[in-house]
Amino acid sequence: MAQKKGGGSTRNGRDSKPKMLGVKAFGGELISAGSIIVRQRGTKFHPGTNVGVGKDHTLFALVDGHVSFGTKGAMSKHTVSVTPA
C-alpha cells in the first residue's frame, strides 16, 4: 500500500514572458536613426517630426538627433519628436 498520495497534476504553472514595454530613450537623449524610442501597446505616444511607427506601434527615430516629448492638439496627445543633431 502506498505511503503517500499520488502527486496529481496542477492547472497552474504557466506565465507569459515579460514584453519589455516602455520608454527606451528619454528627453534630451542623443540617438541614431533607427533607434527605438518607445515600445508600447496601442498609441499612448504619437509620432512627431522625424519619428516613425512600426506595425506594433513602436516609435523609432528616422534621423540622428535629440529626443523631445511634448503634447499636441485639444486632447493634449503625447507626442515624441527627434530634433536633428
UniProtKB/Swiss-Prot annotation:
HAMAP family xref list: Ribosomal_bL27
Record GO biological process: translation
Protein name as annotated: Large ribosomal subunit protein bL27
Region (Disordered): 1-20
Signal peptide limits: none
Residue ranges with Gly residues bias: 1-10
NCBIfam families reported in the protein's UniProt record: L27
PANTHER family, A to Z: LARGE RIBOSOMAL SUBUNIT PROTEIN BL27M, RIBOSOMAL PROTEIN L27
Similarity comment: family membership: Belongs to the bacterial ribosomal protein bL27 family.
A GO cellular component entry from the record: cytosolic large ribosomal subunit
InterPro entries: Ribosomal_bL27, Ribosomal_bL27_CS
Listed transmembrane segments: none
GO molecular function: structural constituent of ribosome
Pfam families: Ribosomal_L27
Keyword Transport belongs to the record: no
Entry keyword set: Ribonucleoprotein, Ribosomal protein
